[in-house]
Amino acid sequence: MPKVAVGGTFQYLHDGHARLIEKAFEIAGSGKVYIGLTSDEMLQKNHSVESYKIRRSRLLEYIKKMGVPEEKYEVTRLNDPCGPTIEEDFDHIIVSPETYPVALKINTIREKKGKKPLEIVYVEYVMAEDGIPISSTRISKGEIDRHGRLKKEA
Protein backbone atom coordinates (compact mmCIF):
# COMPACT_ATOMS: atom_id res chain seq x y z
CA MET A 1 0.00 0.00 0.00
CA PRO A 2 1.50 3.32 -1.05
CA LYS A 3 2.57 5.79 1.60
CA VAL A 4 2.32 9.34 0.23
CA ALA A 5 3.66 12.60 1.69
CA VAL A 6 2.49 16.12 0.95
CA GLY A 7 3.19 19.24 2.95
CA GLY A 8 2.49 22.92 3.17
CA THR A 9 1.19 25.85 5.15
CA PHE A 10 -2.30 25.48 3.67
CA GLN A 11 -3.37 29.02 4.46
CA TYR A 12 -6.77 29.78 2.83
CA LEU A 13 -6.93 26.26 1.31
CA HIS A 14 -7.08 27.56 -2.26
CA ASP A 15 -7.54 25.61 -5.50
CA GLY A 16 -3.79 24.98 -5.77
CA HIS A 17 -3.81 23.28 -2.37
CA ALA A 18 -6.88 21.30 -3.39
CA ARG A 19 -5.08 19.98 -6.47
CA LEU A 20 -2.08 18.86 -4.37
CA ILE A 21 -4.27 17.14 -1.79
CA GLU A 22 -6.45 15.46 -4.40
CA LYS A 23 -3.36 14.21 -6.27
CA ALA A 24 -1.97 12.80 -3.01
CA PHE A 25 -5.11 10.75 -2.42
CA GLU A 26 -5.21 9.67 -6.07
CA ILE A 27 -1.61 8.38 -5.90
CA ALA A 28 -2.18 6.75 -2.50
CA GLY A 29 -5.11 4.69 -3.77
CA SER A 30 -5.59 2.07 -1.08
CA GLY A 31 -2.61 3.45 0.85
CA LYS A 32 -2.31 6.39 3.22
CA VAL A 33 -1.59 10.10 2.84
CA TYR A 34 0.58 11.90 5.39
CA ILE A 35 0.01 15.64 5.31
CA GLY A 36 2.71 17.75 6.91
CA LEU A 37 1.27 21.05 8.09
CA THR A 38 3.78 23.83 8.68
CA SER A 39 4.11 24.71 12.36
CA ASP A 40 3.72 28.27 13.59
CA GLU A 41 7.41 28.26 14.55
CA MET A 42 8.54 27.38 11.03
CA LEU A 43 6.56 30.08 9.25
CA GLN A 44 8.44 32.83 7.48
CA LYS A 45 5.79 34.62 5.47
CA ASN A 46 5.39 38.25 4.47
CA HIS A 47 1.71 38.16 5.35
CA SER A 48 -0.08 37.10 8.49
CA VAL A 49 -0.85 33.40 8.65
CA GLU A 50 -3.48 31.86 10.87
CA SER A 51 -2.39 29.62 13.71
CA TYR A 52 -1.51 25.97 13.23
CA LYS A 53 -4.63 25.01 15.18
CA ILE A 54 -6.95 26.97 12.86
CA ARG A 55 -5.20 25.79 9.68
CA ARG A 56 -5.29 22.18 10.89
CA SER A 57 -8.98 22.42 11.69
CA ARG A 58 -9.77 23.80 8.21
CA LEU A 59 -7.61 21.17 6.55
CA LEU A 60 -9.35 18.35 8.41
CA GLU A 61 -12.74 19.83 7.56
CA TYR A 62 -11.78 20.02 3.87
CA ILE A 63 -10.62 16.39 3.79
CA LYS A 64 -13.76 15.28 5.58
CA LYS A 65 -15.86 17.05 2.92
CA MET A 66 -13.89 15.11 0.29
CA GLY A 67 -15.31 11.98 1.88
CA VAL A 68 -11.93 10.45 2.73
CA PRO A 69 -12.09 7.96 5.62
CA GLU A 70 -9.99 9.00 8.65
CA GLU A 71 -7.81 5.88 8.43
CA LYS A 72 -6.60 6.99 4.97
CA TYR A 73 -4.71 10.06 6.17
CA GLU A 74 -2.77 11.64 8.99
CA VAL A 75 -1.98 15.32 9.54
CA THR A 76 1.33 15.96 11.29
CA ARG A 77 3.14 19.10 12.42
CA LEU A 78 6.09 20.14 10.23
CA ASN A 79 8.86 21.74 12.25
CA ASP A 80 11.33 21.64 9.36
CA PRO A 81 10.88 21.49 5.58
CA CYS A 82 11.65 17.76 5.34
CA GLY A 83 9.50 16.50 8.19
CA PRO A 84 9.38 12.71 8.63
CA THR A 85 10.31 12.00 4.99
CA ILE A 86 14.00 11.69 5.83
CA GLU A 87 13.72 8.87 8.36
CA GLU A 88 10.40 7.20 7.64
CA ASP A 89 9.53 5.02 4.67
CA PHE A 90 7.42 6.79 2.08
CA ASP A 91 6.84 5.89 -1.54
CA HIS A 92 5.82 9.23 -3.06
CA ILE A 93 6.01 12.92 -2.33
CA ILE A 94 3.58 15.34 -3.95
CA VAL A 95 5.08 18.74 -4.77
CA SER A 96 4.35 22.04 -6.45
CA PRO A 97 6.95 24.05 -8.37
CA GLU A 98 7.57 25.91 -5.09
CA THR A 99 8.29 22.74 -3.07
CA TYR A 100 10.07 20.72 -5.77
CA PRO A 101 13.57 21.77 -4.57
CA VAL A 102 12.72 20.47 -1.09
CA ALA A 103 11.83 17.06 -2.56
CA LEU A 104 15.19 16.95 -4.36
CA LYS A 105 16.93 17.76 -1.07
CA ILE A 106 14.95 15.05 0.72
CA ASN A 107 15.98 12.46 -1.86
CA THR A 108 19.64 13.50 -1.66
CA ILE A 109 19.59 13.07 2.12
CA ARG A 110 17.70 9.76 1.87
CA GLU A 111 20.20 8.38 -0.62
CA LYS A 112 23.13 9.36 1.63
CA LYS A 113 21.41 7.42 4.42
CA GLY A 114 20.98 4.37 2.18
CA LYS A 115 17.22 4.81 1.83
CA LYS A 116 15.36 4.56 -1.44
CA PRO A 117 14.46 7.90 -3.00
CA LEU A 118 10.86 9.01 -3.01
CA GLU A 119 9.02 9.14 -6.30
CA ILE A 120 8.40 12.84 -6.86
CA VAL A 121 4.96 13.67 -8.23
CA TYR A 122 5.09 17.18 -9.67
CA VAL A 123 1.82 19.12 -9.72
CA GLU A 124 1.77 22.34 -11.73
CA TYR A 125 0.45 25.56 -10.26
CA VAL A 126 -3.24 26.32 -10.66
CA MET A 127 -3.54 29.59 -12.51
CA ALA A 128 -5.79 32.48 -11.59
CA GLU A 129 -7.92 34.24 -14.20
CA ASP A 130 -4.98 36.49 -15.05
CA GLY A 131 -2.67 33.56 -15.82
CA ILE A 132 -0.59 34.08 -12.67
CA PRO A 133 -0.48 31.23 -10.11
CA ILE A 134 -2.98 31.20 -7.27
CA SER A 135 -1.15 31.75 -3.99
CA SER A 136 -1.98 32.54 -0.39
CA THR A 137 0.12 35.70 -0.71
CA ARG A 138 -2.03 36.96 -3.59
CA ILE A 139 -5.19 36.08 -1.68
CA SER A 140 -3.99 37.91 1.45
CA LYS A 141 -3.18 40.98 -0.68
CA GLY A 142 -6.77 40.95 -1.94
CA GLU A 143 -5.78 40.36 -5.59
CA ILE A 144 -7.74 37.12 -6.02
CA ASP A 145 -10.06 34.78 -4.18
CA ARG A 146 -9.33 31.12 -3.29
CA HIS A 147 -10.46 30.04 -6.75
CA GLY A 148 -8.26 32.51 -8.63
CA ARG A 149 -11.01 34.92 -9.55
CA LEU A 150 -9.78 38.49 -9.73
CA LYS A 151 -11.16 40.77 -7.05
CA LYS A 152 -12.98 43.80 -8.36
CA GLU A 153 -11.27 47.06 -7.49
CA ALA A 154 -13.41 49.45 -5.48
UniProtKB/Swiss-Prot annotation:
Gene3D superfamilies: HUPs (3.40.50.620)
Catalytic activity, as annotated: (R)-4'-phosphopantetheine + ATP + H(+) = 3'-dephospho-CoA + diphosphate
GO biological processes: coenzyme A biosynthetic process
EC number of this enzyme: 2.7.7.3
Pathway stated in the Swiss-Prot or TrEMBL entry: Cofactor biosynthesis; coenzyme A biosynthesis
UniProt cross-references to CDD domains, sorted A to Z: PPAT_CoAS (cd02164)
Superkingdom, natural source: Archaea
Key words of the record: ATP-binding, Coenzyme A biosynthesis, Cytoplasm, Nucleotide-binding, Nucleotidyltransferase, Transferase
Top EC category: transferase
Family classification: Belongs to the eukaryotic CoaD family.
Biological function: Reversibly transfers an adenylyl group from ATP to 4'-phosphopantetheine, yielding dephospho-CoA (dPCoA) and pyrophosphate.
Protein name: Phosphopantetheine adenylyltransferase
Taxonomic classification: Archaea, Methanobacteriati, Methanobacteriota, Stenosarchaea group, Methanomicrobia
